[in-house]
């Protein structure tokens, strides 16, 4: 079964409907971008900001954002600044966000994709507690915080990465109830690697989606719409 993100994003906007109306166009998000920024992601942020009635302004650096008097910032450069000190940084881009993710707490500092994954599992009633979750990838924005949020929900979590032996990886995936693919290695695993009833969250395109005989949150139309909705909910908060 394909589990799409749009219904989850719609439900989140409905949950915040009163906030959206009360704060209409009063919240400002400063987006720090340059030539390395993903244009598709920028467009998605723009569309979602309009739905949430959040104003967007743009800067090319944290220094410029500071001179503009920015308070809430999102750095979409590659790589982003290691620490947006002095700002209310979205997507876990400062120490506060990393600490909250480490203790498994979802709040306005939590990395958005990690929170989106948990929200999707909850929306589709995918059990987490007591399940074996394999997270492939250890990035600061997705892999690590997702692992900690799953752990906080009483999953047994294994983190794999680019240095994990391929044989060990396949063995772990075969025994998993939940697999989060977030390493960006296209085609790393496919349906032959997972067991019946497993839920695969294909964040980074690692999973070959040629077969749909399982619960699949797809690369396109999956976590992405929920991630931008979570981002805007953080701005309102």
What would you call each of these model-derived segments?
Residues 1-78:
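N-terminal ligand-binding/catalytic initiation module
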Residues 2-5, 63-128, 169-170, 187:
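Anion-binding alpha/beta catalytic cores of soluble intermediary-metabolism enzymes, centered on
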Residues 30-32, 90, 136, 160:
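Short hydrophobic segments within beta-strands
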Residues 37-46, 69, 107-189, 193, ...:
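Glycine-rich phosphate/diphosphate-binding loop of Rossmann-like nucleotide-binding domains
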Residues 54-58, 157, 216:
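Generic structural signal for residues in well-ordered beta-strands
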Residues 79, 141, 206:
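Conserved Rossmann-like nucleotide-cofactor binding loop
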Residues 83-101, 196-237:
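Rossmann-fold NAD(P)-binding glycine/threonine-rich loop
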């Amino acid at each position: 079964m394909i589990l799409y993100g749009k219904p989850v994003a719609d439900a989140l906007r409905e949950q915040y409907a009163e906030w959206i109306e009360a704060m209409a166009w009063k919240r400002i998000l400063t987006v720090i971008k340059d030539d390395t920024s993903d244009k598709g992601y920028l467009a998605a942020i723009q569309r979602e900001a309009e739905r949430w009635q959040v104003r967007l302004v743009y800067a090319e650096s944290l220094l410029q954002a500071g001179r503009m008097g920015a308070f809430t910032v999102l750095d979409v450069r590659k790589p982003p600044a290691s620490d947006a000190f002095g700002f209310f940084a979205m997507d876990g881009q400062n120490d506060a966000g990393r600490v909250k993710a480490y203790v498994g707490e979802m709040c306005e500092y939590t990395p958005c994709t990690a929170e989106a994954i948990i929200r999707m599992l909850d929306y589709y009633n995918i059990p987490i507690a007591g399940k074996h979750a394999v997270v492939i990838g250890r990035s600061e924005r997705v892999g690590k915080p997702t692992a900690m949020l799953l752990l906080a929900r009483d999953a047994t979590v294994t983190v794999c990465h680019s240095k994990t032996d391929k044989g060990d990886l396949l063995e772990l995936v075969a025994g998993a109830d939940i697999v989060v693919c977030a390493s960006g290695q296209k085609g790393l695993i496919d349906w032959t690697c997972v067991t019946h009833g497993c839920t695969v969250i294909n964040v980074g395109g690692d999973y070959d989606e040629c077969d749909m005989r399982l619960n699949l949150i797809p690369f396109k139309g999956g976590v992405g719409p929920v991630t931008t909705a979570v981002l805007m909910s953080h701005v309102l908060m």
